[in-house]
UniProtKB/Swiss-Prot annotation:
InterPro entries: Mur-like_cat_sf (IPR036565), Mur_ligase_C (IPR004101), Mur_ligase_C_dom_sf (IPR036615), Mur_ligase_cen (IPR013221), Mur_ligase_N (IPR000713), MurCDEF_pg_biosynth (IPR050061), UDP-N-AcMur_Ala_ligase_MurC (IPR005758)
Designated name of the protein: UDP-N-acetylmuramate--L-alanine ligase
Keyword Cell division in annotation: yes
HAMAP family named among the record's database cross-references: MurC
Residues holding ATP: 120-126
This protein's encoding gene: murC
EC supergroup of this enzyme: ligase
Biological process annotations from GO: cell division; cell wall organization; peptidoglycan biosynthetic process; regulation of cell shape
Enzyme Commission identifier(s): 6.3.2.8
Catalytic activity: UDP-N-acetyl-alpha-D-muramate + L-alanine + ATP = UDP-N-acetyl-alpha-D-muramoyl-L-alanine + ADP + phosphate + H(+)
Record keywords: ATP-binding, Cell cycle, Cell division, Cell shape, Cell wall biogenesis/degradation, Cytoplasm, Ligase, Nucleotide-binding, Peptidoglycan synthesis
Length: 498
């Protein structure tokens, strides 16, 4: 009996409890199960956008972790981010309540579906969203479980009416290799999650299994602009692989004639599929998001659309319908004719891609790039310390905050201040500064922002919440400064604040 079919019978699973339900991956699976008719609840340490959204659907949310939260539950779902000393896990073990990993629950939802699994070190969320848009434009309405909020839908997960399921496949703990996908996407492979894998070669091996575990009739889509992915593809002969890139001249799908601005990217595509005679050119594809990395993400979606015979019109329409993903180069405010961007970038390669996009736009506007970065996890900074020192070259001015721990214990010698100090000592950046308090961002913007500037706030921690409050904070600061002038009338601002 399949989980997707169980509700059609008289059988019941009881209550399914998610520990860390506010996480983007966990909230998506919980939402799908709720929409399928299952009783779902969950707990998290703090309230956030995801917990509020789930509560609005009638899902019970506990703030804080306590053993009484799972008093009447039948199953407990966890992710690798949940520690074994969590009181709810301890209680579940004591009472022998089945504990299910997030990837196992995702795999169950994907069983007997034609599933597209999107993996890679970076770009998964945007690529998943783009593929979903193409499916809908082709008249196929998939179930989607994404790692970020899709702006078109205001959610990261939704039920579809077709037999397709598109999911972001998280590689952080190797459980993604057990996902029963028909189509597998690899956007790139970089040293990441080494606290789990310990060795980069083990991580690469997991991606190899991700492809070779496909059924013989499935296929993979891989970006061979990335040298690690190219080597992996060259070593695999037992599965069909469609390749894409911008620089790789031998890729099956290549973007060229590229133009990008602050709001969009336009490019042409050359398609030369294996075992298909001739070459197809698609002209003037436009995606409403800037950046070379997003063009690569689009090529992955095009590869799926071409292989499934969506047609050129559906592909173009799908991209036209794409409204972006929350926290992926998202404009949150303007100040003094400078644009303030919120971005999820927290790995050196993501930071380089985001800043390269910002630099390209700033150059067109005769502006500068001001980067404010909140490091995420002590272990990530430790393993990639040298890479972090080198990834901010496109920032004209750089501020680095304290590390957002994300539940980790501090590591001696690994701090935001030490990163800035090493960058300065090694002359990797001559305008790198340490920012002790996020509140000081307001002063940084007021002091430095000028017309044409791109102010990029990056990180996977709480810097996003701060970025989304900047409009209010900057306005409050202006009122405070202006109120010192006795001739200044602040009444016009009162309505804005309220």
């Amino acid at each position: 009996m399949l989980l997707l079919e169980l509700k059609k019978t008289n059988q019941t699973l009881g209550t399914i409890h998610f520990i860390g339900i506010g996480g983007v991956g966990m909230s998506g699976i919980a939402e799908i199960l709720h929409n399928l008719g299952y009783k779902v609840q969950g707990s998290d340490l703090v309230e956030n956008y995801n917990t509020k959204r789930l509560e609005s659907y009638g899902i019970k949310i506990f703030l804080g972790h306590a053993k009484q939260n799972i008093k009447n539950v039948s199953y407990v779902v966890i992710s690798s981010a949940i520690h074994q000393n969590n009181p709810e896990i301890k209680e579940a073990l004591e009472r022998k309540i089945p504990i299910i990993r997030r990837a196992e629950m995702l795999a169950e939802l994907m069983r007997l579906k034609c599933s597209v699994a999107v993996s890679g070190s970076h770009g998964k969320t945007t690529t998943t969203s783009l593929i979903a848009c193409l499916f809908e434009a082709a008249g196929l309405y998939p179930t989607v479980i994404n790692g970020g909020i899709i702006n078109n839908k205001s959610t990261n997960a939704y039920l579809g009416s077709s037999n397709y399921l598109i999911a972001e496949a998280d590689e952080s703990d190797a459980t993604f290799i057990h996902i029963p996908s028909t189509i597998a996407i690899i956007t790139n492979i970089d040293p990441e999650h080494l606290d789990y894998y310990q060795d980069f070669e083990i991580l690469i091996g997991a991606f190899r299994s991700f492809i070779t575990n496909l059924p013989f009739y499935g296929f993979a889509v891989c970006c061979i602009d990335h040298k690690i992915v190219r080597k992996l593809v060259d070593d695999i002969t037992e599965r069909k692989i469609i390749t894409y890139g911008i620089d790789a001249e031998d890729a099956h799908i290549i973007a060229f004639n590229i133009n990008t601005d602050i709001a969009s990217s336009t490019f042409d595509v050359k398609i030369s599929l294996p075992n298909v005679l001739g070459t197809t050119i698609i002209e003037k594809i436009t995606i409403p998001t800037p950046g070379r990395h997003n063009i690569l993400n689009s090529l992955a979606a095009i590869a799926v659309g071409i292989e499934l015979d969506f047609g050129i019109k559906a592909i173009k329409n799908g991209f036209n319908n794409f409204k972006g993903v929350k926290r992926r180069f998202t404009k949150v405010a303007e100040y003094n004719q400078a644009v303030i961007i919120d971005d999820y970038a927290h790995h050196p390669e993501e930071i380089k891609a985001t800043l390269a996009t910002a630099k390209n736009i700033a150059n067109q506007q005769n502006g500068k790039v001001i980067a404010i970065f909140q490091p995420h996890r002590y272990s990530r900074i430790k393993y990639l310390f040298d890479d972090f020192m080198l990834c901010f070259a496109d920032a004209d001015i750089l501020y680095i905050t304290n590390i957002y721990a994300a539940g980790e214990k501090p590591i001696e010698g690994i701090t935001g201040q030490s990163l800035v100090d090493k960058m300065t000592q090694n002359k990797y950046h001559d305008k790198a500064n340490f920012l002790a308090e996020l509140d000081d961002v307001v002063s940084v913007i007021i002091d430095h922002a000028a017309s044409g500037d791109m102010i990029i706030m990056m990180g996977a921690g709480n810097i996003s919440s701060f970025a989304n409050e900047l409009d209010r904070r900057l306005l409050s600061q202006e009122i405070l400064a202006s109120s010192q002038n006795t001739d200044f009338d602040t009444s016009s601002y009162d309505k804005v604040i309220r």
